[in-house]
Amino acid sequence: MKKNLHPIMLAGTGSDVGKSVIAAALCRIFKQDGYRPAPFKAQNMALNSYATPEGLEIGRAQAVQAEAAGVPCHTDMNPLLLKPSSDHTSQVVLNGRPIGNRNAFEYFRKEGREELRQEVNAAFDRLAARYNPIVMEGAGSISEINLRDTDLVNMPMACYADADVILVADIDRGGVFASVYGSVMLQTPEDKKRIKGVIINKFRGDIRLFESGVKMMEDLCGIPVLGIIPYYRNIHIEEEDSVGLDYKRMQAVEGKINIAVVLLRHLSNFTDFNRLERDERVHLYYTNNTEDLAKADIILLPGSKSTLDDLYELRRNGVAQAVLRAHREGVTVMGICGGYQLMGLEIHDPEGVEGEIRQLPGLGLLPVITTMQGEKVTRQVNFHFLENAETCQGYEIHMGETRPVPGEAVVPLNKLEDGGEDGCFVNQKCMGSYIHGILDNQAFIDYLLEPYAEKLECHTVLDYRTYKEEQYDKLAEHVRSHLNLPLLYQIMSGND
């Protein structure tokens, strides 16, 4: 029987240093080594979310990490989720259910923090009773000392869990010595003792050239460097936030089916398109440029955390008109979740669920009307699209109800296995659905691409589930080969 290991927390010198991906790698490594790990992030801020099997909502990163660990995702893995709805306000999701909107000042003030702290601590305790080890993830930088008293996710959480903290730094952005040294030295003496190692991430070039740097860092900080993880391009793990979109190509190309995802200001769940990106028949790009939209074969309207605000902006910047013009010229238009709502005749928000805009006309491509509601629908679904016999899978996360225009006979796109219906189908080039993950299903992708078969040559069908498992294994191998794993196990066994 495997010896129980201490929890481990991957803390960061800043945001986007690679904590989430390294956490996924360690989840897979521990699984490979015979443990039963589970991920945990007390508080996550992200627009990318996922529905658990119980129909509750967590951050997508923890769902990915759970998949890497080979365990079902659960709200205890991410008890507190903040979903930004504007520059200053976020929807607060506690234990998988929304409890209201908060601006930054309201959220970070001390009043009410202890209740939230008790909730995230209880979630950790429940998780730790079922799994070992717990692979914890911090948020942003551990050096925001002005927020120390109200922090729920970094060093106070590590102290509660009695976790060994590993500091992750991104050498690719420069200043790695200052960021590591500063992060360590800004901690209290007690917290400083808890930091047991450093991982240098995203290294480019010959690692041997940094050997002297490792010794300097260890001498400066008094903490061992556990590994230098090289930058990679050939491993594909779902990203947590839309920062990765900055590195994706934004224009059409020759010789492929060009699929344009409309780049909304409040775009959410962009992981809906990861499977399409891996299809060798497809070139997928993100844009809000009207000329680039005109070059697409298929336009996808994605999910949005603020649908009415995005609709207002699409009308203001000319993208709405460009989508309608492209559709008249034979381009396929499909909407998912918020994008489905955008395609209807009208969107109403009588109670101000999203904000100050109470009503706007939609694009008018689908004979449906959406009314925003305070209660959120969150669930996993099995479904069949149109008359297709294959069972497909996906999940819903939305706060609106979409109904046919009175007097209109609407054809649903999907029939759910529980007897319900979803979406609206006009023809093969005009449709919408609430189901995230619909484009992870090969049968639906083939149907979507079918009108453009003349552009295609022979291709290999991608089994996306197998592909993702292969990527987790590749990631684990990459991290394992550059990490002092025996020392990490020694630390987590309490023998450091």
Curated annotation (Swiss-Prot):
Pathway: Cofactor biosynthesis; adenosylcobalamin biosynthesis. HAMAP family: CobQ (MF_00028). PROSITE patterns: GATASE_COBBQ (PS51274). The keyword Membrane does not apply. Catalyzes amidations at positions B, D, E, and G on adenosylcobyrinic A,C-diamide. NH(2) groups are provided by glutamine, and one molecule of ATP is hydrogenolyzed for each amidation. Belongs to the CobB/CobQ family. CobQ subfamily. GO terms for molecular function: ABC-type vitamin B12 transporter activity; catalytic activity. This is Cobyric acid synthase. Residues 256-444 form the GATase cobBQ-type domain. The active site is at C337, H436. PANTHER family: COBYRIC ACID SYNTHASE (PTHR21343:SF1), DETHIOBIOTIN SYNTHETASE (PTHR21343). Keywords: Cobalamin biosynthesis, Glutamine amidotransferase. GO terms for biological process: cobalamin biosynthetic process.
